[in-house]
């Protein structure tokens, strides 16, 4: 349920047809969701409630066709890699990855690996990907290292295959998210 569904209007703008980020032409979102295990937490075994979400800002090759970007910090608690490049160049040069706090590094690396695998042999490439964190440590074995670079590839494939529809809630990087002691999610 959304605020607008309850008659609450925020701001002067109107949402697009889907009322999602994908209402912006070319924006695609994909998720890789990891859910396994039940019961008491055993580090390294679970239960696992986590994942990866990627936001691809346009239909072209975002690695070679960047988009303008900016940033603002509202809450200094949280990690988002790639911000200094955005501040310096004003450009986003790859998809945005979202995952749990302890998996930001592997998602960062997975975005680079995804780009490098698409390059012709011998091509030179550098990247400062944007990878951000969500807190899922209450519902997930956050210390178990369950997110892998393959999950980034899965989320990228899902974004490529999406027709603009965005799955929201307990998926991808929002699977185990908790916000102010309430169950949160993506979207």
Region locations from a protein language model:
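Alpha/propeptide regions of enzymes that mature by internal proteolysis
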Residues: 1-186
């Amino acid at each position: 349920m959304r605020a607008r569904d309850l008659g609450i209007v925020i701001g002067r703008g109107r949402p697009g047809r889907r009322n999602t980020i994908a209402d912006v032409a070319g924006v695609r979102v994909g998720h890789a969701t990891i859910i396994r295990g039940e019961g008491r937490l055993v580090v390294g075994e679970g239960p696992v409630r986590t994942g990866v979400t990627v936001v691809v800002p346009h239909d072209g090759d975002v690695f070679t066709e960047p988009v303008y970007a900016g940033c603002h910090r509202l809450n200094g608690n949280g990690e988002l890699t790639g911000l200094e490049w955005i501040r310096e160049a004003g450009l986003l040069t790859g998809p945005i990855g979202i995952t749990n706090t302890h998996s930001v590094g592997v998602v960062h690396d997975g975005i680079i690996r995804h780009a490098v695998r698409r390059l012709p042999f011998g091509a030179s490439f550098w990247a400062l990907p944007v990878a951000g964190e969500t807190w899922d440590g209450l519902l997930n074995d956050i210390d178990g290292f369950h997110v892998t670079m393959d999950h980034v590839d899965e989320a990228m494939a899902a974004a490529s295959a999406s027709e603009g529809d965005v799955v929201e809630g307990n998926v991808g990087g929002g699977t185990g998210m908790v916000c102010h002691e309430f169950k949160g999610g993506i979207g």
